[in-house]
């Protein structure tokens, strides 16, 4: 949290998989998230692990920690005399838990550009590119290890980590800022906290 706040971001966007376990098990571990600070707010979209960890029970915890969870919805933020749309979608495992799956069209309907979409799984970019300016995703852990890139790409729409483009839309797939307990190792794929600087067209 200290490293993130030291960057002095205007807004903080979290692309899912924030927890592994129920609030009863992880509330103490999650407590430092309340220290995140950004003038425009802290926003998140759910990843698959939020659903495995009882997302309905986590929603009030996220709110209490100052994190706005966007589930097929958007926030239109005033920025320097203009607007910025920040949207988030649910994950495609939601249906297994009787919850709505990702619906980027609903999330973005009626919102102004520029639009940033948080979608935990990057393959949604194939569908969303015409409607957005930037998509931020995770899920792949950056491939975990360099030699796993091809396999990770196969199961994630061809995306592994870094920048991708389709026409005027851009996708960034982040490797995440920590480790996953199921494979607590990184080989040549360091974790990161990404600082993006958005510039208006001249």
Predicted regions and their residues:
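Soluble catalytic domains of enzymes that build or remodel membrane lipids, polysaccharides, and related
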Residues: 1-202
């Amino acid at each position: 949290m200290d490293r993130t706040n030291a960057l002095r971001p205007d807004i903080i966007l979290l692309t899912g998989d924030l927890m592994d376990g129920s609030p009863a098990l992880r509330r103490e571990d999650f407590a430092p998230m309340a220290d995140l600070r950004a003038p425009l707010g802290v926003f998140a979209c759910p990843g698959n692990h939020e659903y495995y960890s009882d997302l309905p029970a986590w929603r009030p915890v996220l709110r209490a920690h100052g994190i706005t969870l966007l589930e097929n919805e958007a926030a239109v933020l005033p920025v320097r005399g203009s607007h910025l749309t920040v949207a988030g979608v649910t994950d495609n495992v939601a249906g297994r838990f009787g919850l709505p799956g990702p619906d980027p069209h609903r999330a973005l309907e009626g919102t102004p550009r520029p639009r940033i979409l948080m979608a935990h799984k990057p393959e949604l970019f194939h569908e969303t590119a015409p409607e957005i300016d930037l998509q931020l995703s995770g899920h792949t852990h950056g491939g975990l290890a360099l030699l796993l890139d091809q396999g990770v790409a196969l199961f994630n729409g061809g995306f592994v980590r870094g920048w991708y483009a389709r026409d005027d839309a851009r996708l960034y797939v982040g490797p995440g800022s920590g480790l996953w307990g199921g494979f607590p190792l990184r080989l040549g794929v360091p974790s990161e906290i990404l600082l993006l600087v958005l510039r208006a067209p001249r």
